[in-house]
From Swiss-Prot:
Native organism: Saccharomyces cerevisiae (strain ATCC 204508 / S288c)
Misc. remarks from the entry: Present with 3140 molecules/cell in log phase SD medium.
Annotated localization: Cytoplasm, Cell cortex
Function field: Deletion results in antifungal drug fluconazole-resistant phenotype.
Low complexity composition bias: residue spans: 96-113
Disordered, as annotated region: 90-115
Record's GO cellular component terms: cell cortex
Alphabetical list of Pfam families matching this protein: clamp_Gag1-like, Lock_Gag1-like
Matches recorded under InterPro entries: Fluconazole_resistance, Gag1-like_clamp, Lock_Gag1-like
Keywords: Cytoplasm
Protein name according to UniProt: Uncharacterized protein YLR407W
């Protein structure tokens, strides 16, 4: 007795089609997700790149109407203007003299603090040599001590150096937030578009930008062939 198997191929075809459609659906979903993620990453990276550069501010133009109004008010006041101006000048001169006195006092305070705080700039080698020579009747032979003191003052950190180091770390963190594949865009804005930076790049970061730009513009490849 022969059993009909005509339904079996139909089931297999239906299963194959369903399985294929399911695969396509998953693949399309994955591609869509990756595309949207890349768009988000691109827009976020563009914002990070723009944050490196200064934004040009529009020029402020003085209004002529304001000038006319100010002139009219001056003419309406008449004789009272001179007295007002005299009072202003008097107040300003008093404030100026007070400011000068404050500046003078501050400069004296700074000079005194510099004298009390020894650093590489105010370290006087000649005075130090005289002081050391007076401590002994023997011929002076402590130049090495002066040299070590100068070296110690030269290598000790200052407020300015610490501030510069902190600024460098902050700039490095900002730059590292940009993906490496976007360095060529930074090069284009910096070199081609001639946009000024908000803050200077660290040397290592600047070299990475130049390398990416030269690779993109084939400067490295042309240089290897002896071409400009």
């Amino acid at each position: 007795m022969t059993v009909s198997t005509s339904k079996t191929p139909k089931k297999n075809i239906k299963y194959t089609l369903t399985h294929t459609l399911q695969k396509w659906k998953e693949t399309l979903k994955k591609i869509t997700h990756e595309t949207l993620s890349s768009i988000d990453d691109s827009s976020g990276s563009d914002e990070k790149i723009e944050a490196l550069f200064t934004v040009s501010q529009p020029a402020v133009v003085a209004s002529k109407g304001i000038d006319r109004d100010s002139g009219a008010s001056m003419s309406q006041v008449g004789g009272g203007v001179n007295s007002t101006l005299e009072m202003k000048l008097t107040d300003e001169s008093e404030e100026s003299s007070s400011a000068n006195n404050t500046t003078t006092t501050a400069s004296h305070t700074l000079s005194n603090s510099k004298k009390s705080t020894q650093n590489f700039e105010n370290y006087n080698v000649v005075e130090e040599r005289i002081k050391l020579a007076q401590k002994s009747k023997a011929p002076f032979c402590n130049a090495e001590k002066i040299w070590k003191r100068r070296r110690q003052l030269w290598t000790q950190p200052t407020e300015q150096s610490e501030s510069a180091n902190n600024d460098g770390v902050t700039r490095r963190e900002i730059f590292q937030a940009i993906p490496q594949e976007y360095y060529a865009r930074v090069y284009k804005k910096l070199v081609v578009d001639d946009k000024p930076l908000r803050e200077p790049l660290n040397l290592e970061d600047a070299l990475q930008v130049i390398n990416a730009g030269w690779t993109e513009t084939r400067k490295w490849a042309n240089a290897a062939k002896g071409m400009p």
